[in-house]
């Protein structure tokens, strides 16, 4: 099987650059899989789990919080607003972040601050759901 070159980049670092069989991406219009030879496309991402597939099995999973995905003839590049390997996430720490975000929503003094806090809370809950 022809491999797909894949790069996952966050503002902090390059998380992965590898040749893989497939990448399942949480697109804003729905999840989609990318293989070598995929038609070129550019789309936005929603918060969710990005899975790298090798040998028919999910080899690595990352939580991505928004961003862009670009498929070209050379491969797939994901520029994520935030990305972290699911294997590195700690449940109790995440639960505390959710609790803090809930307090931020409750304490917000104006609509703009509340909306930002609610977006953060929703993303953290999405991440918690991805962890199971």
Regions found by a protein language model. Give the residues of each.
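Short, charged, intrinsically disordered terminal tails
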Residues: 1-3
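Compact, glycine-rich, soluble single-domain proteins
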Residues: 5-100
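Acidic/glycine-rich phosphate/pyrophosphate-binding loops and surrounding catalytic core
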Residues: 84-132
């Amino acid at each position: 099987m022809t491999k797909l070159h894949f790069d996952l980049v966050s503002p902090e670092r390059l998380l992965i650059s590898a040749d893989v069989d497939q990448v399942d991406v949480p697109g804003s219009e729905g999840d989609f899989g990318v293989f070598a030879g995929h038609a070129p496309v550019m789309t936005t991402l929603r918060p969710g789990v990005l899975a790298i597939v090798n040998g028919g099995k999910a080899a690595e999973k990352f939580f991505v919080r928004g961003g862009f995905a670009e498929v070209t003839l050379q491969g797939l590049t994901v520029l994520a607003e935030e990305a972290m390997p699911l294997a590195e996430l700690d449940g109790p720490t995440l639960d505390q972040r959710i609790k803090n975000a809930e307090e931020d929503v409750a304490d917000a003094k104006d609509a703009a601050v509340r909306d930002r806090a609610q977006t953060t809370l929703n993303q953290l809950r999405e991440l918690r759901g991805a962890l199971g």
